[in-house]
Amino acid sequence: MKENYNYPLDLSWSTTEMTEVLSFFNQVEKFYESKVEKELFLESYAAFKKVVPSKMQEKQLGRDFEQSSGYSLYRALKEVEASGKRFVSADKA
């Protein structure tokens, strides 16, 4: 993880929308740094998708987030979705 990185946010989003997106980014960070509860991660992703319904924008945000943090949204999502466990982490997914 890189120290002191910025989150890729769209300034046209409302405060609530930014909170939803940040919540998902936090879940991704938690996936890499400790572990996440699968259900909560997927709920957070669903809320993120309501704010960012476009696949293209999701990929761009994912690339920007990975460049600044070193964490892949795509990899985290795929590993959590594929896991049959209640709690999932990057090193045990």
UniProtKB/Swiss-Prot annotation:
Signal peptide: none annotated. InterPro entries: BH2638-like_sf (IPR023324), UPF0223 (IPR007920). It holds the Pfam family UPF0223. SUPFAM superfamilies: BH2638-like (SSF158504). Belongs to the UPF0223 family. NCBIfam families: PRK04387.1. This is UPF0223 protein llmg_0515. It comes from Lactococcus lactis subsp. cremoris (strain MG1363).
